[in-house]
């Protein structure tokens, strides 16, 4: 009798251990809810001036075309919201991280990531944010947001992310 009970409990434990986390919808918009866009997951209860607040209020990332570092009109709108957010919190400093997809050499992508981060910084400075509050770093292709070799993965990895220090 005890053997059967232990066997059933063991089977239930194995089934519970096999459950998976909910998946995000593939092919969703890179700037959609939960991806650092305004109104994303966690917009409630965000500590004012925190990374979570930046993500919920303004969005923390902009995306780039392949092998490009120019700011699109959509990215310009996000950066204007980031500048407004930074004006509300004048003691906050941020780091702008430049990222690339996996194509290209490590050296080339580090330089491209730096150009992307610098392009974002230049826009924020032009919008009145002191350069002393903004630092840049390039991670090239070393820190992908999405692992994969599809166009969707590439598009989400070509980005600049603003992080609160």
Map each language-model feature to its residues.
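Short beta-alpha junctions and helix-cap segments that line functional grooves
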Residues: 147-150
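Periplasmic peptidoglycan-binding/tethering modules of Gram-negative envelope proteins
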Residues: 19-93
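Bacterial N-terminal signal peptides that target proteins for export
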Residues: 1-8
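Extracytoplasmic/secreted proteins, especially bacterial periplasmic and envelope-associated proteins
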Residues: 74-81, 107, 111, 115, ...
């Amino acid at each position: 009798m005890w053997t059967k009970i232990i066997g059933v409990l063991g089977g239930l434990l194995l089934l519970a251990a096999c459950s998976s986390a909910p998946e995000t919808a593939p092919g969703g918009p890179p700037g959609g809810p939960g991806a650092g866009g305004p109104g994303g997951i966690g917009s409630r209860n965000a500590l004012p001036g925190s990374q979570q607040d930046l993500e919920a209020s303004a969005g923390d990332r902009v995306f780039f075309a392949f092998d490009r570092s120019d700011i699109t009109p959509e990215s310009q709108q996000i950066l204007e919201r980031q500048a407004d957010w930074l004006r509300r919190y004048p003691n906050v400093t941020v780091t702008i991280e430049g990222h690339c997809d996996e194509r290209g050499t490590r050296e080339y992508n580090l330089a491209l990531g730096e150009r992307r981060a610098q392009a974002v910084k230049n826009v924020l400075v032009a919008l009145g944010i002191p350069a002393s509050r903004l630092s840049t770093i390039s991670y090239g292709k070393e820190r992908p947001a999405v692992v994969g070799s599809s166009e969707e993965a590439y598009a989400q990895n070509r980005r600049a992310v603003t992080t609160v220090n």
